[in-house]
Structure formats: C-alpha cells, structure tokens
Amino acid sequence: DAVSITSSSDAAELFGDLPLSSDRPDFWNRTFSEASGFIGKSPEEQLPVRKKLISILIGRDGRMEPLAQKYFSLESLIRIQQREIGTGFIGGKAVGMLLARNILSQEDHEFYAKRFVPHDSFYLGADVYYTYIVQNGLWNLRLLQKTKEGYYKYARELHEKILTGRFPHEIREQFRYVLEYFGQSPIIVRSSSL
C-alpha cells in the first residue's frame, strides 16, 4: 500500500537531500562542482575553497564571516547551493537560520538532536531579484527610485510594475519544482524582498 506523506518533517527526512537541477554550465555551477572535489580532503586543503564559497554564497559581512568559517562545512555549503533557486547570496534570514542550526548542532549536539527536526529549505539567490528587474525592463526605473529625489516619486510606479512582471522560464521551472517537491505540505516563504 502507498502511504501519503503529509508531515513536513517526514518529507524532509525522505527527500531533504534532493538537489535542484544543476545542469547550467556556468561559473557558479563550475565553482561548486570543483569544490565537491575537495570533500574528504583535509581541513587545510578545504579552507581556501570554503572561504571562496562563503564569500559568494553567504557573504563577506565582517561579523558573519568568522562565524560562517567556523560553523559551515564544505559539505553544508554545497548542500545550500544544491537547493538554491538562481545564484548568489542567499540572504541574511536564511544565513541566520542555517548558522543558528549549525551552532546548536555543533556546540550541543545532544540538545539539538532531541529538539530539532530536519530542515527542508530552498533558498532564493540574489540574482533572481536583479534578473526579474532587468527582464521586465525595470532597471532604469529602479535606479531612479533609489535616488533621494526619486525614492517616493517613483515608488508607486515601480511597485505596480513589479507586481505585473514575469520571471524567466528557468526560474519559473525551479519554482514549480519546489512546489511539486512539497506537494500538499504547507510551506513558509521568508523574504524581506517580497
């Protein structure tokens, strides 16, 4: 008999390691593919690779970088990228959530193991926003709105045009994948950009 899985924690346990399609032969995927070759090597050999991945995925924030270096393994950085829609930084909320989980897991594993279910997150890369703005012909309007004089003057027009834009086909396909992945399970979307 087939059993329907409706619990998000059960779904995370079964499918949490499934990556998004990564058949794009670009700098981003080549970088992470090459980084995969360092899995199993010594921490000293992994260090420059981890630093590079942290700088392009997590960010170069002065306060966050040392914590990321301490608590993100090479494997965990590659797993983040495998579940990222688009490319680029994953954003502060996602970084904070992942960092907090890693700190708890590494500093008090017994506490963590008893109280936390596996997380089952996907991440939206920063390039998705910029691609959306450019593909919908909004770049110049965004630049005008970012000025002191244009902040309020162009805000409504930019807002309305953003609401009527479309994502590129590849991004829409990745969104579909995520929705199909979760099926009927409830999802939470966290973003200050929405």
Segment roles from a protein language model:
Residues 1-194:
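N-terminal beta-alpha lobe that positions the nucleotide/phosphoryl donor
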